[in-house]
Amino acid sequence: LASANLEAVSDSGYLGNPYRAARVFGAAVPENVPRTRSSRALNLRAIGDLGSPNAPRSAIRGSYRYFWDNWDVKSHTVEGGYSRYVGESFLLDGFVRHYRQSKASFYSDDAQVQNTYVTRNRQLGTYSGNTLGGKVTYSWRKVPGQYEINFNGGLELLRYRYSDYTDLRSGGAYGLDASVLQLYVTANY
């Protein structure tokens, strides 16, 4: 099964943050971003069933997303994953994702010229990220056509690296490493 989606978004109004400051010649100045933003995204996805009548149900998936906007931000996201049932009650799922983004035309860590628009919002800067994740779903109670109750647990390991954003505490490039643990119950009826 495969899909291709094209997304178009147009924003207008106050798109900045009144509490965020940019740096110009080392001095803090209020952030100023355009009041309009138009973006597009192309998303390609495919999923395939790997199971056979005598083997556990399993599937592999892959996706690619390209994003661009009129602020000159461009990004690429590539993701791959694998899912497999273990017995009748457990579903195991794993994935890996890579993200890469270029900076907005008015982004600067420390601007050396005063322009109309300026921001130091690191999410509009150049950065890349990698995620490795896994999830386990246990089907506790299930009556087809009536209800299903599942226990879920997931773990994601994230790493983001910003190439043109200085951590003011250390003077080096900013980075983020995180582990996200999720435990939750779902009920469908």
Regions found by a protein language model. Give the residues of each.
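Beta-stranded membrane pore/translocator domains
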Residues: V143, T186-N188
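Aromatic- and glycine-enriched pocket-lining scaffold segments that form the walls
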Residues: L1-S3
